[in-house]
Regions:
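Charged, alpha-helix-forming regions
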Residues: 1-123
Length: 123
């Protein structure tokens, strides 16, 4: 997997959202974000080899392999807010809608929350 990634986020999202993520959680989100293509109309199920995924998020200790489900579970619990400056409304949303570990193939499937589409697609 190429380690030169480009991540695109809307300026609105950057200015009007607040979230608190650990370094590993940030790396997961940025790695996953880099798989979103500019022409994508919808989020996909992003499948990554677990060994490559651990390397990409900077986990070198193989004992962390067993901690990866804990890291993604904690990430799925992280709710953040996106504020609408015009209406005063705000959205509370989690980054991920699903994570599936496929032990037989050594892969992990990750899915962004569909509520993030306006902030990450068609930019």
């Amino acid at each position: 997997m190429n380690q030169n990634f480009v991540v695109t986020k809307s300026n609105y999202f950057i200015k009007n959202s607040s979230y608190d993520l650990s370094l590993e959680e940030q790396r997961i989100i940025l790695t996953l974000s880099s798989l979103v293509q500019p022409e994508d109309q919808d989020f996909k199920v992003y499948t990554i080899k677990i060994a490559e995924f651990l390397e990409l998020i900077g986990v070198v200790d193989q004992s962390k392999y067993t901690e990866l489900p804990k890291i993604t579970r904690e990430l799925m619990k992280k709710v953040f807010e996106i504020n609408d400056e015009v209406t005063g409304d705000f959205l509370q949303v989690a980054w991920l809608s699903a994570v599936k570990y496929k032990k037989s193939s050594g892969e992990i499937d990750l899915e962004f929350s569909p509520h993030l589409k306006p902030y990450m697609l068609n930019l």
